[in-house]
């Protein structure tokens, strides 16, 4: 059935839709399946399925219903581009406080339309949120400024937070885990649970929390510097998440503001993120995106992009989210990922298709991880243009030839190298931990700095 007369209006302009302030706009790359309707007909069916329609006309439809139809307002068949305007009144609101929910946004914009028989594939690349709808989202309650404050740094341009993930990701018992934390904290700032770490039978949660608390206090006494830890509180059950969070805060007591809560936001979903955001508004909310590649990977033709995921995370209230390494690490990514970093940190930013004003909503910190080490960091900072972020290097710290503390120091020295605009190999001659990173990661050293062996001489022997 051709629904383009009802669910498409190509006379609408994006400028007028934005000025009207009553529509969420979404940009998709879509390909119709052969043997069905043309591009516009398929796009209109997509809009119908995403809002008020189905595959047939129904007798219960009235004029009001038609007034909240989603509408295709722009297509470019050559680029497989379609843009759809969704009236904000379509989206569900909480009955307790009238707030918006990402679950409803996803259900409409990327829900049943992903399984339509006449669509070969469709993937969301960007979306725009008007002020009236934006104001209904929680947004972050804490930011990197809160972490900088704990660390005793300026709250403007407080700089690089040197972090790690304790490796191996699974298999360490509580005491060896805490020992690794102590070792890293002698040189670094921030440690996070890896996403599967929790309450394994060989590493009971409460015992691990107590020992990490002890390790943090000893490291702070030894270095005279505050330390940070991000605990995984992800669970299927809301009550389990709250129980974990409350136990952690009770245990760390006067160091409670040194604690972030990590939530596996993709696998556990918006409900888990909102549970952490609302029950623990004073804690830094660390959004881990494990599993997201199933839909965000460039190889995936359905779903949505990592850019879209990150933008949704800011709306939900994530204080920080993993944003990849812009092609400088081991995970999929590209230099264009910096647009994602700007979208979640700035108050006014351009996406692939839409400009977004955030109206003062708190920013979300880019958290960088995935195959990073000190040798890759100067180029990463140069591409991004600043170092106001958290970086969690697992192998990049504990793979250092002199151990976790030296690995942490090498990462901090990498930021110093970039800030000074120094040649990394020349810089290494005066900074032992950074120099030893060349020996620790020789494959990267050969690829990035081909003549390093001769230039460093005995330092690289």
From Swiss-Prot:
It comes from the Bacteria. One of its GO terms (molecular function) is magnesium ion binding. Keywords: Calvin cycle, Carbon dioxide fixation, Lyase, Magnesium, Metal-binding, Monooxygenase, Oxidoreductase, Photosynthesis. Its EC number is 4.1.1.39. Transmembrane segments: none annotated. Mg(2+) binds at residues 192, 194-195. RuBisCO catalyzes two reactions: the carboxylation of D-ribulose 1,5-bisphosphate, the primary event in carbon dioxide fixation, as well as the oxidative fragmentation of the pentose substrate. Both reactions occur simultaneously and in competition at the same active site. The basic functional RuBisCO is composed of a large chain homodimer in a 'head-to-tail' conformation. In contrast to form I RuBisCO, the form II RuBisCO are composed solely of large subunits. Belongs to the RuBisCO large chain family. Type II subfamily. This is Ribulose bisphosphate carboxylase. The gene is cbbM.
């Amino acid at each position: 059935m051709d629904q383009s007369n009802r669910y498409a209006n190509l006379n609408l302009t994006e400028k007028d839709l934005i000025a009207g302030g009553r529509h969420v706009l979404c940009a998709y790359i879509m390909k119709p399946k052969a043997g069905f309707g043309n591009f516009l007909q398929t796009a209109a069916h997509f809009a119908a399925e995403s809002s008020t329609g189905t595959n047939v006309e129904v007798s219960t439809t009235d004029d009001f219903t038609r007034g909240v139809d989603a509408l295709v307002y722009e297509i470019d068949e050559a680029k497989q581009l379609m843009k759809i305007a969704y009236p904000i009144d379509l989206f569900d609101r909480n009955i307790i406080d009238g707030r918006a929910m990402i679950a409803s946004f996803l259900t409409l914009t990327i829900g049943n339309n992903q399984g339509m028989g006449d669509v070969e594939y469709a993937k969301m690349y960007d979306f725009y949120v008007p002020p009236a709808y934006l104001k209904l989202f929680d947004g972050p309650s804490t930011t990197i400024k809160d972490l900088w404050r704990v660390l005793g740094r300026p709250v403007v341009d407080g700089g690089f937070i040197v972090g790690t993930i304790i490796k191996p990701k699974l298999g360490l018992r509580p005491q060896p885990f805490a020992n690794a934390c102590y070792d890293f904290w002698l040189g670094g700032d921030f440690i996070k649970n890896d996403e599967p770490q929790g309450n394994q039978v060989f590493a009971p949660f409460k015992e691990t929390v107590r020992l990490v608390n002890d390790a943090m206090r000893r490291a702070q006494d030894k270095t005279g510097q505050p330390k940070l830890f991000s605990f995984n509180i992800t669970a299927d059950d809301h009550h389990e998440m709250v129980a974990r969070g409350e136990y952690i805060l009770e245990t760390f007591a006067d160091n409670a503001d040194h604690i972030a809560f990590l939530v596996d936001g993709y696998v556990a979903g918006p409900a888990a993120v909102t549970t952490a955001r609302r029950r623990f508004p004073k804690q830094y909310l660390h959004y881990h995106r494990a599993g997201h590649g199933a839909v965000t990977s460039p190889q995936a033709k359905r779903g949505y992009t990592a850019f879209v995921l990150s933008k949704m995370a800011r709306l939900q209230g994530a204080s920080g989210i993993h944003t990849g390494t812009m092609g400088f690490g081991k995970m999929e990514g590209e230099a264009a990922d910096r647009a994602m970093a700007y979208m979640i940190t700035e108050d006014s930013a351009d996406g692939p298709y839409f400009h977004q004003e955030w109206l003062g909503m708190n920013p979300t910190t880019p958290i960088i991880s995935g195959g990073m080490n000190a040798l890759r960091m100067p180029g990463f900072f140069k591409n991004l243009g600043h170092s106001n972020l958290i970086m969690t290097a697992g192998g990049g710290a504990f793979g250092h030839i002199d151990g976790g503390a030296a690995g942490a120091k090498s990462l901090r020295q990498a930021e110093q190298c970039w800030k000074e605009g120094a040649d990394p190999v020349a810089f290494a001659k005066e900074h032992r931990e950074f120099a030893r990173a060349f020996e620790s990661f020789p494959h990267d050293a050969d690829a990035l700095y081909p003549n390093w062996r001769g230039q460093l001489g005995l330092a690289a022997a």
